[in-house]
Amino acid sequence: MRAALIGAGQIARQHLSCLKKLPGVELAAICDLSPATAEAAAERYCVRAWFTDHRAMLEKIRPDVVHVTTPPTSHFGPAIDSFNAGAHVIVEKPAAPTIEELETLVQRAREAGRHLVEDHNYLFNQAPQEILRRIEIGEFGAVIHVEVLICLDILGPCGFADPNSPHPALTLAGGAIADFLPHLASLAHLFVGPHRTAQTVWTKRKPSPLPFDEFRAVLDAERGTAALCFSASAQPDAFWLRVYGERMQATANLFETRLTFERPRNVPKPLRPFFSGLEEGKTIRRAALATLLRKFKEPGAYEGLWELLARTYGALADGAAPPLSASHVLEVNRMVEALKPKKRQL
């Protein structure tokens, strides 16, 4: 399959690195508005063709799949043009700044007989996949509640709060935090399904160019409840996923490889914390070593993206549906829409 990429920024590097190693995939072209950026990316990843006009690229290269990794508010045009050129589209999150634009993208994909896949990469990390496996085989029991908490210093030297170089995500409703809502929503959706109601709190604790730096939400969903949080002040950085089931509880830090399970034990009740602590300690030590080792090899922290792309290309090559359907993308983004700050909060 012939692949092309539009938008050769930071996240594009992960897409390009993966594409170069996927069997049966030819990375045919790279496009970026900056000639220097496009040429440098093409040289780094040994891609023969580079462009500054995505329409010219689509017409000349005729790719089977296009990766749209431009800033979030600019996905719509390149995605529509890619569908019109007969390509499937893999788009970075958020796929569109409004639910109306996303619905248009999904409709155009259906009309063209193509697939739209949004990068919900954390769904395909090993930890969520292992939790999901235990749920599917009945070991976990029905999910009662899920918690997703991102602690990340976006006010530090990471680009989000630089007044001299405004980050593209600041144009989204909710600012930089909105760039993380698809991660929170997709994980909640994975374990408790589409939301029915959502209550949110958006606040700002520290002076910065960001409109908000703290976010909390509680959702009632089809299969349970969810609590979603983002904090720019809580430290250390972490990405906690906690899933509570009828027979088991799971805790994972998705910035690491840590995953622990807690279940009722057939020992005297006073001894349960002791045995649980022993098992958890062993698991955390193994995860610490695994987290260190993954820093020295690909895909590193982007294991979920690589797995998503591998499954997607495998499905497309077989003429099958990709692992993330259009209905999934719509349901997650409707949840994201419900999480965005209301006018009274802006």
Language-model segments: residues:
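Beta-loop-alpha module in the N-terminal Rossmann-like domain of NAD(P)-dependent dehydrogenases
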Residues: H15, A49-R108, G304
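Contiguous beta-strand/loop segments that form the cofactor/metal-binding neighborhood of enzyme cores
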Residues: D179, A185-P264, W306-D318, V336-A338
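C-terminal helix-rich "cap/oligomerization" subdomain common to oxidoreductases
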Residues: V65-H67, K297-L346
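N-terminal Rossmann-like dinucleotide-binding module
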Residues: M1-Y45, L346
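Hydrophobic residues in well-ordered beta-strands that form the structural core
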Residues: F51, V91-E92, L116-E118, A252
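Rossmann-fold dehydrogenase core element
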Residues: T104-Y122, A142-H145
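Predominantly a Rossmann-like dinucleotide-binding segment in NAD(P)-dependent oxidoreductases
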Residues: L123-Q199, R205-P207
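Alpha-helical membrane-targeting segments
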Residues: R263-P299
